């Protein structure tokens, strides 16, 4: 159900695949990321998926004694796609509200490997930071497990090189090879501790 109480917390928005038909290395990295988020006392925010890397990140956070908040549109709940073990589930009216809620709640973003939906979420966050819709102080970290995003990273570099985006905008995201590097990148961006965010969600 929708929770409208305002609260101030540090939450890390984790984008990632809903597919489970992937190599075990991706699942292990997602679970480790969730555990590391929990170890810092931060909330693991994701799309509430019951499969794939979203579930793995949730499981990692919960098994480490932390919390996980899932944000999911009603039609996905109706289809039985929501993970029942989440600490808190926020149901939205549609995909747009889902993405807005996750962005509003987050102190930082980590994009794990994923398909079109994950890439769209990550690039929308990148664009929102660029446009000032999202606070530019919220770091966006690409978790490049097994070099999964090498081609996308190269595409962004090419866009900057050919004048389709400002070269300075390349600094709006950070690349991490491992979950530990992702956490360290977030801490460096804030000078150690991420800033808690006040949200209506």
Model-derived features: where do they sit?
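Hydrophobic alpha-helical segments of small multi-pass membrane proteins
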Residues: 124, 140-144
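A donor-sugar binding/catalytic signature common to diverse glycosyltransferases
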Residues: 103-123
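A cross-family phosphate/adenosyl-ligand binding-site feature
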Residues: 2-105, 132-133, 143-180, 184-185, ...
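Conserved SF1/SF2 helicase motif Ia
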Residues: 135-137
